[in-house]
């Protein structure tokens, strides 16, 4: 699968790295908050259920996502693969922006410019 993704991105020579900080140590707590918030709940909805979880995890996951972004060369891109809602929490922690729940195969484009971040959608075709 990684070979296919690298070929599709035309980045066969770019190394694949693992950022362990993007893995939550409290996955079960995320599942509980998601279930309590209801089907299709956003990170914002889960925050109403477990404010400490979302605030602390967003900070941790956002910091890990910042490490990925900071390691990129100018014009570089990274593909971060993981589970919802922790990806959404990482985006919140990095950018301060709440995004809606992402389905399988969905993602966002985060652009860093002069120390600030913008979040855009990625078209799925």
Task: Name each region found by the language model.
Residues 1-45:
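Phosphate-coordination/substrate-recognition cap region in phosphate-metabolizing enzymes
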Residues 2-6, 71-72, 110:
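Alpha-helix C-terminal capping segments
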Residues 17-32, 74, 88-125:
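Acidic, low-complexity terminal tails and accessory targeting/binding regions
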Residues 59, 63, 84-89:
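A structural signal for well-ordered alpha-helical segments within the folded catalytic domains
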Residues 73-82, 86:
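Beta-strand elements within well-structured catalytic alpha/beta cores of enzymes
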């Amino acid at each position: 699968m990684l070979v296919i993704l690298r070929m599709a991105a035309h980045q066969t020579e770019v190394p694949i790295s693992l950022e362990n900080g993007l893995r939550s140590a409290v996955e079960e707590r995320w599942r509980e908050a998601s279930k309590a918030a209801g089907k299709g709940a956003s990170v914002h909805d889960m925050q109403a259920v477990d404010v400490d979880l979302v605030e602390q995890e967003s900070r941790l996951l956002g910091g890990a996502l910042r490490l990925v972004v900071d390691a990129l060369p100018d014009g570089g891109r990274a593909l971060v693969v993981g589970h919802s809602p922790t990806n959404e929490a990482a985006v919140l922690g990095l950018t301060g922006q709440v995004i809606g729940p992402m389905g399988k195969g969905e993602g966002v484009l985060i652009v860093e410019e002069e120390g600030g971040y913008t979040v855009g959608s990625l078209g799925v075709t």
